């Protein structure tokens, strides 16, 4: 899967996404394909962090619902990302209920060896959370922390939008994301001042929407 965008990068496409969604609602199939290409990488990363290897199947189910209900959507590009994330989350939770399993951590020893080293910057350490092995580590977090990190870092939602997806207050989502990132920093082997640096960057990155 490679790297998926950080929130700042994802949001750069919100204008194009909003325009594509509007055209798609008027029946433009090419515009729907553009919206899919913009949203799918982050959505798939979000689902990988919840259901692991079944993410592709769950994403397919989610996109069927998205296409079916597209005419009901009202909002801009950022709103569309939040709306699609809500649908994908519902499908993921349905999938987990059918499996009756709890997501498990799946990182390997080699994965840990390849994580950010002590000489990496705090920003690089945060960036590393978007790689596929990191999504496996995120799956091992408590559910509230995992979903908060995934929605903020992988999908690129702001605080209020992530809170709407989860049905929680923005402050609660921000706290869960901060705690999740701090726990991941420990798993990455980043301790002491470096760990605090990562979580400080996380606080700025994952703070309330500007």
Residue ranges of model-derived segments:
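DNA-recognition helix of helix-turn-helix
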Residues: 89, 93, 145, 154, ...
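A short, charge-rich alpha-helical start-of-domain segment used by transcription regulators
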Residues: 21-45, 134, 146
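Sigma70-family region 2
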Residues: 25-26, 49-50, 61-80, 98-100
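Short, basic/polar amphipathic helix motif occurring as a linker/hinge flanking DNA-binding modules
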Residues: 95-118, 125, 193-198
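Short, charged helix-capping/linker segments at alpha-helix termini
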Residues: 4-7, 25-33, 44-61
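Amphipathic alpha-helical segment used for protein-protein interaction
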Residues: 26, 116-151, 155-165, 207-209
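Structural recognition of an alpha-helix C-terminal capping motif at a helix-to-coil junction
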Residues: 57-64, 78-90, 175
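Arg/Lys-rich amphipathic alpha helix in sigma70-family domain 2
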Residues: 49, 71-75, 85-107, 127
């Amino acid at each position: 899967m490679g790297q998926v965008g950080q929130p700042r990068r994802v949001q750069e496409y919100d204008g194009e996404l909003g325009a594509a969604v509007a055209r798609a609602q008027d029946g433009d199939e090419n515009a729907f394909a553009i919206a899919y290409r913009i949203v799918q990488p982050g959505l798939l990363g979000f689902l990988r962090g919840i259901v692991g290897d079944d993410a592709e199947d769950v994403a397919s189910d989610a996109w069927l619902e998205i296409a079916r209900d597209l005419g009901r959507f009202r909002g801009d590009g950022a709103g569309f990302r939040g709306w699609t994330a809500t649908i994908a989350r519902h499908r993921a939770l349905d999938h987990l209920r059918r499996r009756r399993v709890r997501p498990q951590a799946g990182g390997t020893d080699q994965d840990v060896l390849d994580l950010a080293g002590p000489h990496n910057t705090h920003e690089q350490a945060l960036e590393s959370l978007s790689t596929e092995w990191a999504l496996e580590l995120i799956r091992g977090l408590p559910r509230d922390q995992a979903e908060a990190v995934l929605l903020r870092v992988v999908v690129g939602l702001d605080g209020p939008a992530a809170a709407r997806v989860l049905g929680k207050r923005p402050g609660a989502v921000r706290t869960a994301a901060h705690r999740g990132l701090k726990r991941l920093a420990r798993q990455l082997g980043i301790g002491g001042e470096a760990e605090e640096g990562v979580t400080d960057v996380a606080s700025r990155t994952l703070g309330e929407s500007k």
